[in-house]
């Protein structure tokens, strides 16, 4: 991606992901969304199987696979559709924003580089000190290089 568009893209993605942040804070039901929604709506596994045009045991297998994090997106989408739901998913940064994620990665890379150089210089009795300032400067350089101001 061209550097001049990277900052704009980060802002756009952060705006798109904002509603998902609140959803990410709510845990999945212990037995999964499929089972929770099916039971709450009073829909039998047989009804789901009929809509999916499959065996009666498959909906229960899908519910178990979802609860165990083994279900595919394709299967989850089909099961959601059979329940009259849409599958909505997103990758949500663990921090507040995607930009913070990028900055943290750049800072970690800069710190590794600066500490490596500082260590080499210390071995040669030329240590400069001020590691924090060097890390911050290197972080800013890396972000500028990626087109992020």
Positions of the model-derived regions?
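Recognition helix of helix-turn-helix/homeodomain-like DNA-binding domains
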Residues: 52-70
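N-terminal flexible/basic segments that precede or flank functional cores
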Residues: 1-29, 97-149
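Helix-turn-helix/winged-helix DNA-binding modules
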Residues: 29, 40, 68-71
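Short, contiguous strand/loop micro-motifs
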Residues: 20-22, 32, 62-66
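DNA major-groove recognition helix of helix-turn-helix/homeodomain DNA-binding modules
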Residues: 73-89
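Short basic helix-loop element that most often maps to the first helix and adjoining turn
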Residues: 2-3, 32-51
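Short C-terminal boundary/hinge segments that cap the last helix of small helical domains
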Residues: 84-100
């Amino acid at each position: 991606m061209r550097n001049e568009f990277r900052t704009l893209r980060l802002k756009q993605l952060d705006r798109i992901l904002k509603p998902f942040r609140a959803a990410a804070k709510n845990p999945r039901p212990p037995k999964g969304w499929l089972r929770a929604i099916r039971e709450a709506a009073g829909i039998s596994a047989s009804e789901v199987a009929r809509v999916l045009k499959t065996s009666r045991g498959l909906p229960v297998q899908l519910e178990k696979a979802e609860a165990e994090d083994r279900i595919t997106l394709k299967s989850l989408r089909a099961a959601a559709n059979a329940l009259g739901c849409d599958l909505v998913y997103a990758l949500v940064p663990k921090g507040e924003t995607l930009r913070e994620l990028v900055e943290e990665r750049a800072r970690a890379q800069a710190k590794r580089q600066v500490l490596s150089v500082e260590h080499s210089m210390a071995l040669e009795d030329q240590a400069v000190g001020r590691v924090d300032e060097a890390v911050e400067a290197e972080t800013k350089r890396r972000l500028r290089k990626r087109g992020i101001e």
